[in-house]
Amino acid sequence: MKLTDYVKQVSLEDFCRPFIHHVQWNRRLRSTGGRFFPKDGHLDFNPKVYQELGLDVFRKIVRHELCHYHLYFQGKGYQHKDRDFKELLKAVDGLRFVPSLPNSNSKPIKLYRCQSCQQTYQRKRRIDTRRYRCGLCRGKLLLINQPED
């Protein structure tokens, strides 16, 4: 089933209102499941949410974006802070936030410990231990765990 057909179906089933604008996938979305554009009424969806979290979660995200869509065109409060939006989202069982996706781009955490005071530091980037020292006692830093790259 095409994305546009699916969104139209969800709109009719859950909102009893037609969806008449454009829908597209947007791979560049990272922290959100979808986006509504009031200027022209189209919706963007994150394909990773559908691929990794499944159709059930994706349907709830479609409902969320359709809440923005239908409330905007009814002239009601369509933003997250508005009561109309919160009530409609609850009524159609949409998601308020997207569950976190398994992030393949995350860097492993490197753990450093001061040899003098035992203070630990967690960093995503490597620290040059010959150049940098402990911020508390100026002691020498030692890399404790070497993550697999």
From Swiss-Prot:
Q: Which UniProt keywords apply?
A: Cytoplasm, Metal-binding, Zinc
Is Cytoplasm among the key words of this record? yes
Can you tell me which residues bind Zn(2+)? 64, 68
Cofactors (names): Zn(2+)
Q: What's the record's note on cofactor binding?
A: Binds 1 zinc ion.
Q: Which residues form the SprT-like domain?
A: 6-143
Q: Which GO terms describe its molecular function?
A: zinc ion binding
Catalytic residues, chain numbering = 65
Places the protein is found: Cytoplasm
Q: Which Pfam families match?
A: SprT-like, Zn_ribbon_SprT
An annotated GO cellular component of this protein is: cytoplasm
- GO BP: any one term: response to stress
**Family assignment from sequence similarity:** Belongs to the SprT family.
Q: What is the name of this protein?
A: Protein SprT-like
